[in-house]
Amino acid sequence: MKFYISATGIKKVTISNPGVGIGKGSGGCAAAAAALAARRFSSRTLLLLLLLLAIVLPFIFVRFAFLVLESASVCDSPLDCMGLRLFRGGDTSLKIGEELTRALVEETTDHQDVNGRGTKGSLESFDDLVKEMTLKRRDIRAFASVTKKMLLQMERKVQSAKHHELVYWHLASHGIPKSLHCLSLRLTEEYSVNAMARMRLPPPESVSRLTDPSFHHIVLLTDNVLAASVVISSTVQNAVNPEKFVFHIVTDKKTYTPMHAWFAINSASSPVVEVKGLHQYDWPQEVNFKVREMLDIHRLIWRRHYQNLKDSDFSFVEGTHEQSLQALNPSCLALLNHLRIYIPKLFPDLNKIVLLDDDVVVQSDLSSLWETDLNGKVVGAVVDSWCGDNCCPGRKYKDYFNFSHPLISSNLVQEDCAWLSGMNVFDLKAWRQTNITEAYSTWLRLSVRSGLQLWQPGALPPTLLAFKGLTQSLEPSWHVAGLGSRSVKSPQEILKSASVLHFSGPAKPWLEISNPEVRSLWYRYVNSSDIFVRKCKIMN
C-alpha cells in the first residue's frame, strides 16, 4: 500500500508496504477495494432499516393498543381484532353493529317504576348520553343499556303528550263558543223588546200545514239556534219545492225564547216553521215518570263509565280513544238527545217524518225520502258506508256493546254495522203498532240489573237494541257521517255527492277545533247578512 503526499518544496514522498509483494500489487488492491465496498453497503442498509423501524414501530404499537381496548367489547381476543384489521384489511363496523343489536335485544326492560310511567336512571337528552359515555368510558353493552332506557322514557313521554292532547281536544268540544252565547243573549233581548220577534209561529194561515200529511215534515230536537238555522236554510235552498216542507223544532225552555225570536224575525225567507218548548207539552204523569227514569239510568251509565276511566288514569286500549272520550260529552246526558224514542208521543198527528240532527247540512233535495218504501219497517237509515258493504269503521256493534256479557252476545253480532243516526226516515204509524219504546225502557232496566256494563254511554246503543229487525237500509249517498272527527276520511267526490253531511264527532263546525277542510261546507249556509250574526262575529 502506497501513500503519495505532496507538499511545498517536496515533490513526492512514497511510503511502501513491505508486506506486499511486487508481483501481487494489482490483485491485492482489487480485493481490498471490494471488501471496503461491502462494508460500506452493509452499514448503509442497516442504518436505513433501523430508521424505518423507528418510524413504523410506534404506529404498530398505537394500533395494537387500540385493538386491545376494542377487544373487550367487540372482538373475542386482541388477535381476532388484528386478524380483522391486518389480514382481511377491513374494519369492525359490521361486528360492532351485530354486537350492538345483540346487546339491545338482550337488554331487559325491567326499569319501569311501579306505575310503569318512567325508567329509573334514564338520561334526559343526547348530550347527557354523550357525557355519560365519555366520562365513564362505558363498553358497548353499557351503551346499549343506557340508550334503551333513554329511548323508552322518551317514547313514554311522546305517548303521554299525544294522549293528553287528545283529552284536551275532546274537552274543547264541550264548551259553548262565545259567539253562540252572544247570539242567544241578543235574541233573548230582542224577544223582550221587539213585538215581531214574539209573533206567532207559524202564522195562523199556515197552522193547518202542521198536521197535513201531504207536506214533508222534518223534525229537529235542538237547543242550538245557529245550527237549526243552517239545517233549515240548507234544506230549503236545495229543495225543488221548498214550499212543501214543514219544520218542527223542539227545544228546551232555556232556548225557546231565542229560537222563537230567530225564526220569527227571519220568517220571510223560511217555509213553515214551528218552534215548541218542552215546557209546552202536557204529557201524562206516566210518560213523565218514564222519561225521568230513562234519564236517571243514562246518568248512572255515564258516571260508571267516567269512574272506570278515572280509575285507569284515563288510559285506553289502542283504537278506543275516540269512543271512550266522546262518551263523556255532556250531550250524552241531554234530554233532547234521548227524547227521540218518544217522537210518536211528541207528534201524535204525524205519520211519516224525517228526523235530522242539528249538526247536519243538506246538499240536495230530500223530497224523495217521503216516497221511500220502508217495506213495513219503522226506520229508514244508512247502514253501509261509501267504502262498501259491511264497511263501517268505528261503528260496528262491538264498538258500542260489551260482548263479554251473554245478554249482548246472544242478541247481536259483533261485526254487524250499526245504522247511522242523524238523518232517518220514521214511519210513525208503523211505530205505534210496535212496542219499540217499551223495549227501549226494558233494555235500560236490564242494564241496571247487569251492573251498567252492557254498553257505552249514549242514546244510540239501547236504540239499536229496541229497533232490532225494524230497520230498512238506505243508499249510502243519502248520509255521509264522521265529519266531526279529527281527520275526515271520506273522499271529496263522496262529500260533494252526499245528500246530507253529518258532522258527527266532537269537532262540530261551529267550534274552533273543527276541520277547516269541511267547515266551509257548513258555513256557506250561515246567514252572514243577519245583524245578530255580524254583531256576535260568528263568521270570524
From Swiss-Prot:
It is a single-pass type II membrane protein. It is an enzyme of class 2 (transferase). The chain crosses the membrane at residues 48-68. It comes from the Eukaryota. Its EC number is 2.4.1.-. Keywords: Cell wall biogenesis/degradation, Glycoprotein, Glycosyltransferase, Golgi apparatus, Membrane, Signal-anchor, Transferase, Transmembrane, Transmembrane helix. Residues 69-540 are lumenal. Coiled coil: none annotated. Pathway: Glycan metabolism; pectin biosynthesis. Expressed in roots, inflorescences, siliques, leaves and stems. One of its GO terms (molecular function) is polygalacturonate 4-alpha-galacturonosyltransferase activity. InterPro entries: GAUT, Glyco_trans_8, Nucleotide-diphossugar_trans. The keyword Cell wall biogenesis/degradation applies. Residues 1-47 are cytoplasmic. Disruption phenotype: No changes in the cell wall content. Glycans are attached at N402, N435, N527. SUPFAM superfamilies: Nucleotide-diphospho-sugar transferases. The keyword Cell wall biogenesis/degradation applies. One of its GO terms (biological process) is cell wall organization. Its main location: Golgi. CDD domains: GT8_like_1. Belongs to the glycosyltransferase 8 family. May be involved in pectin and/or xylans biosynthesis in cell walls. This is Probable galacturonosyltransferase 15.
